Amino acid sequence: MVTYVERDVRQMVNVRDLATFRRFVRMCATRTGQVVNLSSLAADCGITHNTAKAWLSVLEASYLVHLLPPYHRNFGKRLIKAPKLYFCDPGLAAWLAGIREAGSLAIHPMSGALFETWVVGELLKAGCNRGRTPALHFWRDSGGTEIDVVAERGTVLVPVEVKSGATLVPDYFAGLTRFRGLSGAREGLLIYGGAASQRRSGTRVFGWRDVERAAAMVV
């Protein structure tokens, strides 16, 4: 962290207050898996909105974070327009957020966000391993209905939901069902923290160990 701030960042942008920048990076880590709110981020760090925007661009350019853009089609709904923030390394995000023991992760408030961060990272990694940049987005309307990842494979949409829970419950499928009805997507994917992979009506379910199989259907 210190090496990154003091050496790499200074090559990209003139950061005068290194302590504040370190705080900014930590605040970003606690927001992994969330829609970017630059005003809130700036206020928490005591910096201006423009500075927060510039520093976030630095983190993205140095591959510390990835910004997942919103899917552009609204299907008659008002949409969230800001991107979602993901740390490229979920382990680093956990460490910066103060999580030091693997055993404490399961009960930590960030466990779901970190699991989602890991899955999104695996999808992006799968695309890179295939020599292409996958067209990944997220979708959320003003009513709060959200799809964690919407993949565009040519003209085909593949909605993906990510749930950290180990037991499947009906609520896990609600967003996928709604999005498929709005978009006409034929099939959705659910990646969850359990072990069993299976097929449900209109949804392929993958346990976390099968994330590579799921990624092959996305990228």
Model-derived segments and spans:
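Short beta-strand/turn micro-motifs composed of small residues
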Residues: R140, I191-Y192
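Accessory nucleic acid-recognition modules appended to NTPase machines
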Residues: M1-L157
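Structural signature of nuclease core domains in nucleic-acid processing machines
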Residues: T155, S183, T203-V205
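Switch/connector loops and helix/strand junctions flanking conserved nucleotide-binding motifs
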Residues: W95, V169-P170, S197-S201
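Arginine/glycine-rich "motif VI" loop of SF2 helicases in the C-terminal RecA-like domain
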Residues: C128-N129, T177-R186
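Domain-level recognition of nuclease-like catalytic cores that cleave nucleotide substrates
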Residues: G193-V219
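Short beta-strand-loop-alpha-helix junction that forms the active-site gateway
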Residues: R153, V162-P170
